Regions:
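Hydrophobic N-terminal alpha-helices or hydrophobic patches in metabolic proteins across all domains
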Residues: 1-262
Length: 262
């Protein structure tokens, strides 16, 4: 039985990796026309919350009515979708009992990643619209600012997605915080590992500038989130102990009360 479960785990892990590399390969050659399945709903959300109007230009993307902003294939967020899917799948395979890992977690993780990608994309583009008139901040030019904003938003949403997926965990808050390194490792794997394997480092300074930002920003985001959650745990009594310890303490209090009343 153990061998069977191990074989299924290996097969599921292989299926997840096949999905990841298939999506990555598809995105590397896809045009804006082929990415309408994610560009169209993203643009609809942006129009809803910004009041801006966009129209689709074949092979280019969605362009604003004033021709100042383009939602192109690079704005599709497919890399984030891949990262979110891989993170959710890895969490299920690594942190949950093998008996609970049915094959349905793969399409469920993919759908959840798609929904969160739409939300993260919409947020990032709305902020980019607000920053549109800013040419530079301190030593950052518009391209660097756009990159910084994208990395910050995407990793923030990736970590929040992980925390939401852990909401039913029976472990304490501090155990969950320790596992928060999973989204960091997955993010590094897709945003740094795959480009390195593809030889992107040959681009020289541009790649290493990108790699430095990708390495540092998620660490700062994760430290900030962990700090906020730790502070919240200190202020909120029910989060001071792991869940199992809380149950033990509760049972002990109940037994003590019974003894006192008798």
């Amino acid at each position: 039985m153990k061998l069977k479960m191990s074989a299924r785990w290996v097969a599921q892990s292989a299926a997840v990796l096949i999905c990841v590399f298939a999506l990555k390969q598809y995105y590397s050659t896809a045009s804006a026309d082929q990415l309408k399945w994610i560009l169209t709903p993203t643009t609809a959300c942006v129009e809803l919350f910004s009041g801006e109007s966009f129209r689709f230009e074949s092979h280019a993307g969605y362009i604003s009515a004033d021709h100042r902003f383009l939602i192109a294939s690079s704005c599709a967020g497919v890399n984030f979708l891949i990262t979110a899917f891989l993170m959710l799948s890895a969490r299920r395979l690594l942190f949950e009992p093998p008996t609970s890992a049915t094959w349905s977690f793969i399409p469920v993780s993919l759908f959840a990643a798609y929904v969160v990608t739409l939300i993260a994309n919409t947020t990032r583009i709305l902020i980019a619209l607000k920053l549109q008139g800013i040419s530079a901040i301190d030593s950052l030019d518009s391209n660097q600012l756009h990159r910084l904003e994208g990395i910050f938003i995407y990793f923030l949403f990736l970590t929040l997605l992980f925390l939401v997926s852990e909401r039913n965990s029976s472990d304490g808050l501090y155990s969950v915080l320790r596992r928060c390194f999973l989204p960091l490792l997955v993010y590094y794997s897709t945003m740094l590992g795959i480009p390195l394997l593809n030889g992107s480092y040959r681009a020289g300074r541009n790649f290493w500038e990108y790699a430095t930002v990708v390495f540092l920003v998620p660490v700062l985001v994760l430290c900030g989130l962990c700090g906020c959650l730790s502070a919240y745990a200190q202020l909120t009594p029910q989060f001071r102990l792991p869940a199992k310890s809380q149950r033990t303490a509760k049972l002990a209090r109940e037994e003590t009360n019974k003894f006192v009343t008798t």
